[in-house]
């Protein structure tokens, strides 16, 4: 047998081992987020927010109009994509690892914690930030879930009460949109 033959056998065995323990293609696929978009189309909230992975970070950019001017508003990805009943069908924050609520760059935190956005004088909020995804472990991403904009500022889980640890005391849900695959 040649060295090449041994290498081929080694790679086949390694691939089978990795696949058996969840580190093959399926692991990579769960770690890589396909480009996504959340389109806000229900008046008065109009806009779009894009999600694009860059290594260990998710770039979030876009804008939503029709929000209360001059406020900081909590934003989160919620577990479900349902938008009914004033966004309550979106369920709780996306939290596959049962962590405390926190800031978008801190740990522990929910996978769906996006922090606060500032609404300008004209009622338009601009999204333009990176979210750390390194260390969150493999999960199936944001596709099919809802992006929710809340009525209050997110306290980022810094208070000692239960509301802070679960929702950041962000208040009622103002606007929501289902996150779907983005066209190339």
Curated annotation (Swiss-Prot):
Residue sites binding Zn(2+) per the record: 93, 101, 110, 113
Stored SUPFAM superfamilies: Cu,Zn superoxide dismutase-like
Principal location listed in the UniProt entry: secreted
Entry-listed glycosylation sites: 61
GO cellular component: extracellular region
Endpoints of the signal sequence: 1-18
Cofactor(s), by name: Cu cation; Zn(2+)
Source domain of life: Eukaryota
Keywords, alphabetical: Antioxidant, Copper, Disulfide bond, Glycoprotein, Metal-binding, Oxidoreductase, Secreted, Signal, Zinc
GO molecular function: copper ion binding; superoxide dismutase activity
Covalent S-S links between cysteines: 87-176
Record-listed E.C. numbers: 1.15.1.1
CDD domains: Cu-Zn_Superoxide_Dismutase
Catalytic activity: 2 superoxide + 2 H(+) = H2O2 + O2
Keyword Signal carried by entry: yes
Subcellular location: Secreted, Extracellular space
Record-stated family: Belongs to the Cu-Zn superoxide dismutase family.
Subunit and partners: Homodimer.
Primary role: Destroys radicals which are normally produced within the cells and which are toxic to biological systems.
Identification of the protein by name: Extracellular superoxide dismutase [Cu-Zn]
Source organism of this protein record: Schistosoma mansoni
């Amino acid at each position: 047998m040649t060295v090449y033959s041994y290498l081929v056998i080694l790679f086949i065995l390694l691939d089978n081992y990795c696949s058996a323990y969840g580190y093959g293609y399926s692991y990579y696929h769960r770690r890589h987020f396909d480009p996504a978009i959340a389109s806000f189309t229900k008046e008065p909230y109009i806009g779009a927010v894009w999600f694009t992975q860059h290594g260990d970070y998710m770039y979030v950019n876009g804008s939503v109009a029709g929000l209360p001017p001059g406020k900081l508003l909590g934003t989160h990805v919620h577990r479900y994509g349902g938008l009914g009943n004033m966004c309550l069908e979106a369920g709780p924050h996306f939290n596959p690892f049962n962590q405390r609520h926190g800031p978008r760059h801190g740990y522990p935190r929910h996978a769906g914690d996006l922090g606060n956005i500032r609404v300008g004088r004209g009622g338009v909020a601009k999204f333009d930030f990176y979210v750390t995804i390194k260390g969150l472990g493999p999960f199936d991403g944001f596709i099919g879930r809802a992006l929710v904009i809340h009525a209050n500022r997110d306290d980022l889980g810094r208070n000692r009460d239960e509301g802070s640890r679960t929702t950041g005391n962000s208040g009622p849900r103002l606007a929501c949109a289902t996150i779907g695959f983005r066209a190339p």
